[in-house]
Amino acid sequence: MGSIENPEIMASTMLHILPLAGKVYGITGGASGIGLATAQILSRRGATVCIADVDPKAMASAEVYFSGQSGAKYSITKVDISKRSEVNAWVDGIISQFGRLDGAANVAGVIGKIHGAVPVSEMDDDEWDKIVAVNLTGTMYCMRAQLRNIVDGGSIVNVASIHGLKGFANHAAYDASKHGVIGLTKAAAQENGAREIRVNAVAPGAIYTPLMQKNWDITGRPKDAPFDDPSAFRRQGTAMETGNVIAFLLGPDSTFVSGSVYSVDGAWI
């Protein structure tokens, strides 16, 4: 006797296997590091991922990865998040192509050319303006466009930093920008609660990514130098470990979590 397929059981099974099937997420900085890890996790769970990035080499590598994944639904767009028009066009394009926006991870950020090397008294105006324009104003541009288009019950996760929770000497511009991201997150969470739109942040500590390597290049730190960050876990974290926390906050298991900042730092001391 042939089996009779129950559509409700089949749908339930698919949701268990692919809990984000039918969902559409935007990820800035999504072609490398934490952004790419987040996009990969969401895609594996069935979501459509819409990546924004500015690095052509990283974007090409991401294209190779996602085009090689059976059934992956994705788009990759060149977007400078410090430019309002590019951000708006990117989000409008998501709606036009995929019909909805269920959530977003705002990961894109810069550390500048003097990260960890210059005190406030020596701060360069252009360096300050660039870091704030991308990390803080750019995140606001993204949030604004996303909140105007996101579905009720959607979720936005902003990537702040341990630098948004503490102050570090010779990191003034980066610290200020990441403190600002946390302030934006908490304000937007209050403003959008009536629609049950969740807005949270993650604060990564020592996570090995291309951005961390750039910082080491600036300060002259060898890649094989002994671990020296004040973390109880005596190692750097990974982009995938951070992406898993972001995916949790974007997904269906965090529906009463908003206005929070999740540290991903191996117990920073």
From Swiss-Prot:
Induction: Expression is up-regulated in spores. Pathway: Hormone biosynthesis. Signal peptide: none annotated. It holds the Pfam family adh_short_C2. Its EC number is 1.1.1.-. Keywords: NADP, Oxidoreductase, Virulence. This is Short-chain dehydrogenase/reductase ABA4.
